[in-house]
């Protein structure tokens, strides 16, 4: 008999607990929604839960006018607390923890906004400090992407290619894109010479010097030939004894 009574009592307690859980869950949801609305709208009636003075006991909700801080939802909570249920303390502590966490999140968000403003000011100041010609004071290669610098380098490379000192130039254009560091190397010209310039290497211009000397000797020979007396017509000197005459082709 007593077993039947214990079963009935246990079933009654279970049903009572199951009936109280949805009520407290809905009440906690109301507290959270009210707190979220007041936190996102600080200009609303009564201000935030911190300024209202009743944010802790009332689940972070602001009272009408910021007086006692008891909202209609907190009164419902007091009425429901009249029943002897140990879960009420847990619900109140959970509401208080939610309120504290929400306040901390709101302060962090406001602090993040101020940091964003300061960052934007710093970035705008950095842009103002950049000279108009595109050159900055850092040590990276960001200046090489300026149009003026590229034109100057192309003109210098063109002038080097037009030189007539028998030097063979080969230019290589290297483009490097480093997306992590933000540094760009647009053009690097490396010239490799096969013969070298005058005075750069010993014996580098022997061919040029030899060509100049041969041209000078040819000019001197022409001057000597013009100064020599012309021979009479018909008197052709004999060649060497072992060879034929120089005008044998005329006789033949």
Swiss-Prot record:
Decide whether keyword Transport is in the record.
no
Q: What is its main location?
A: secreted
What is one term from the GO cellular component aspect held by the record? extracellular space
Its signal peptide is 1-19
Q: Compositionally biased, Gly residues: which spans?
A: 44-69
General function of this protein? Responsible for physiological and behavioral changes in mated female flies.
What's this protein's name? Accessory gland protein Acp32CD
- Its source organism is Drosophila melanogaster (Fruit fly)
């Amino acid at each position: 008999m007593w077993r039947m009574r214990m079963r009935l009592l246990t079933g009654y307690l279970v049903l009572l607990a199951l009936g109280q859980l949805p009520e407290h869950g809905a009440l906690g949801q109301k507290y959270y929604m009210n707190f979220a609305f007041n936190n996102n709208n600080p200009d609303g009636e009564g201000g935030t839960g911190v300024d209202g003075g009743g944010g802790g006991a009332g689940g972070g909700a602001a009272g009408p006018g910021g007086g006692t801080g008891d909202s209609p939802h907190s009164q419902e909570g007091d009425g429901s607390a009249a029943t002897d249920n140990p879960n009420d303390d847990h619900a109140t502590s959970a509401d208080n923890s939610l309120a504290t966490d929400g306040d901390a999140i709101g302060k962090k968000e406001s602090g993040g906004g101020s940091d964003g403003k300061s960052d934007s000011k710093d970035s705008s100041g950095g842009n103002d400090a950049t000279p108009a010609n595109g050159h900055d004071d850092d040590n990276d290669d960001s200046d090489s992407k300026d149009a003026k610098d590229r034109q100057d380098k192309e003109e210098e490379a063109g002038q080097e290619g037009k030189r007539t000192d028998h030097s063979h130039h080969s230019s290589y254009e290297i483009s490097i894109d480093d997306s992590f560091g933000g540094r760009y190397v647009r053009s690097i010209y490396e010239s490799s010479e096969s013969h070298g310039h005058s005075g750069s290497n010993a014996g580098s211009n022997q061919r040029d010097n030899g060509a100049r000397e041969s041209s000078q000797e040819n000019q001197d020979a022409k001057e000597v030939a013009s100064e020599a007396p012309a021979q009479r017509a018909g008197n052709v000197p004999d060649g060497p004894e072992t060879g034929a005459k120089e005008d044998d082709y005329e006789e033949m």
